[in-house]
Amino acid sequence: MEQNKTEPYKIGVMMDMPGFPGASDMFGAAAQFALDEAFEIGLLDRPAVTIQVDHLGQPYGDGYHSRNAYRQLVEEDQVLAIAGPLTTDNSLAILEMVESMKVPAITICGTQDYVGKYAFNLSNGNLADEPHYIAAWLKSRGHKRIAVVRDYPSRIGMEFHRFFEYATQQFDLEIIGVGNVYPAPTEESMTEVLGRLKQTDPDALVYLGFGEACRELNNGLRNNDWWPERIMTSAFVQATYHEFFAELIDGWYGIDQFNERNTRFADMLKRYHQKTGRSLTPNSATSSFYDIGHCIAIALSRMEIATPEAVASALETIRLLPAVTGGPGTYITFGPHDHRGFKGLDYLNIRVSKNGGTELDSFEFSAG
């Protein structure tokens, strides 16, 4: 009698930011590679395949695009878990659906409000932690009086700013001016806002936002003939995607999670090249989705029955898993009431954009 054939496990990938070379084309490939490695070493009893749905999420489209993508992966493709979406806005747009449809979604969003029984997070940046990292860096450079340009109205810009206010209190800094720009500002509006901030004569400039404004930040500074020391949130990560984005924010420092000192990431990139003959871009887009794929693979290996609910329960058993994202001390731990996985003081770092590339800054976070 012929034995029944096993079906591969199906895992969804939500790509809500298509069109970013060095990122959009890395996420699915990195997640699939983690699943492939798990099968090859015998962690999984069968292959796992990714099904990717590209869609234009916020701030380019609206929340319906992400909701439709999640619904398609759950109802039509019947996946066991989902990697993505990427951004805070789109993750919050699907949160109620994630909780009602009970298919776990592991996002890389930074908000503190993506919370639920089936909502998991390996954040590529963090809207609460980043402001404290930035404030500590500013203090280490001897800065006191800080000007802020932020996305507004914007959930990301507003949450960043709220926690930056807390951080300035902790690190004894003063916000002396705040300028609001739309998440996708014009050169004219950026020039006007930065001109007003220049008049406050700050020690340094901070950008708090999603990152589409990076296309105009240096234009606005150039038009005002103003080049203060400046730092931004994890909007900076796009500088590691492609030379084009690095050149847009030349001279800026920013929060990132790509760290050359983490040899686990370098080893993973080498294995991928040896296996496929292709290369993954060394950045936190690649590393975070490999980590997501790795976590899903472990959960698939531990689930007691093959259902999305069982995958969610199995994710909560992951403890002290060394990450390829972040520095050497970064690890992943989940628990029943702890779905924000990255841990360790070096899960974030600061880099600077120079000459079409980026360099790791020597700053190390200290809470005092």
Locate each region found by the language model.
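Extracytosolic ligand-binding ectodomains
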Residues: M1-G368
